UniProtKB/Swiss-Prot annotation:
Assembly, per entry: Mainly homodimer, but also exists as homotetramer, homooctamer, and homodecamer. The homodimeric form seems catalytically inactive.
Protein name: Fucose mutarotase
Catalyzed reactions: alpha-L-fucose = beta-L-fucose
Membrane-spanning segments: none
Gene name linked to the record: FUOM
EC number: 5.1.3.29
InterPro entries linked to this entry: RbsD-like_sf, RbsD/FucU_mutarotase, RbsD_FucU
Active site residues per record: 24 (proton donor), 69, 120
Family note: Belongs to the RbsD / FucU family.
Binding site for substrate: 32, 79, 120, 138, 140
Length: 154
């Protein structure tokens, strides 16, 4: 937790540091409690702990600071359901919540859905993985950092 003006208090110093160091196109994974964060981070990404936080509340806080990439089809991606979960009709209401939060932050593009093992491979290339306490199944979310137009052309 940090005590700074304009910075959401639930963002840890480690997460703020990662967000600041990320460049255009870098990705960050907001991982649910079932995600193998420590194993994935052995491949390179920085592991950041946010135990006890849900991804929706963390997403709202992160999006106050992180610009999303507007040069890609979708700057946000979730893990697609495996076939057996699709067959049994498993619902993913957390995705609707993510889409609502993303829209409020100005992102009108749909969530990309990535096959499970492709998601793991993409996560291995992320800048950081934030291990949360999110309990929703298929709650994992990848965000791609965009650019800030600090000196817009006249």
């Amino acid at each position: 937790m940090v005590a700074l003006k304009g910075v959401p208090a639930l963002l840890s110093p480690e997460l703020l540091y990662a967000l600041a160091r990320m460049g255009h196109g870098d990705e960050i994974v907001l991982a649910d409690l079932n995600f193998p964060a420590s194993s994935i981070c052995q491949c390179g990404p920085m592991e950041i702990r946010a135990d006890g936080l849900g991804i929706p509340q963390l997403l709202e806080a992160v999006l106050k600071l992180l610009p999303l990439d507007t040069y890609v089809e979708s700057p946000a991606a979730v893990m697609e359901l495996v076939p057996s979960d699709k067959e049994r009709g498993l619902q993913t209401p957390v995705w609707t919540e993510y889409e609502s939060i993303l829209r409020r932050a100005g992102c009108v593009r749909a969530l990309a859905k990535i096959e499970r093992f492709e998601f793991y491979e993409r996560a291995k290339k992320a800048f950081a993985v934030v291990a949360t306490g999110e309990t929703a199944l298929y709650g994992n979310l990848i965000l791609r950092k965009g650019v800030l137009a600090l000196n817009p052309l006249l």
